UniProtKB/Swiss-Prot annotation:
Oligomeric and partner information: Part of the 30S ribosomal subunit. Forms a bridge to the 50S subunit in the 70S ribosome, contacting the 23S rRNA.
Classification via NCBIfam families: S15_bact (TIGR00952)
Similarity section: Belongs to the universal ribosomal protein uS15 family.
Organism in which the protein naturally occurs: Synechococcus sp. (strain CC9902)
Transmembrane region(s): none
SMART domains, per database record: Ribosomal_S15
Presence of the UniProt keyword Oxidoreductase in the record: no
Region spans: Disordered: 1-25
GO molecular function, one term: rRNA binding
Compositionally biased spans, kind Polar residues: 8-25
GO terms for biological process, alphabetical: translation
Protein name per UniProt: Small ribosomal subunit protein uS15
Keywords, in A-Z order: Ribonucleoprotein, Ribosomal protein, RNA-binding, rRNA-binding
Recorded GO CC terms: cytosolic small ribosomal subunit
Length: 89
């Protein structure tokens, strides 16, 4: 359910805003979205894994807060990020 180093680097490269960017809101939302997608798949197979479900809800809340922050700072960055990640259809 965690991301490998190569997968993290791939996400960083596709969502970074400049060459050394590893922690911007866009990168954090992309990593959280990937972890959420993986954990959702795990929970479909393991319905009674309640501790993982709790972690999933925490990650969703963290992503929601980051997206609200992005929307307050720049509506354009927010729109580009959610369309690129395919969240909130």
């Amino acid at each position: 359910m965690s991301l490998d180093t190569t997968e993290k680097q791939q996400l960083i490269n596709t969502h970074q805003t400049h060459g050394t960017d590893t922690g911007s809101a866009e990168v954090q939302v992309a990593m959280l979205s990937e972890r959420i997608n993986r954990l959702s798949g795990h929970l479909q197979n393991n319905i009674h894994d309640f501790s993982s479900r709790q972690g999933l809800l925490k990650m969703i809340g963290r992503r929601k807060r980051l997206l609200n922050y992005m929307r307050s700072k720049s509506e354009q960055r927010y729109s580009e990020t959610i369309s690129k990640l395919g969240i909130r259809g």
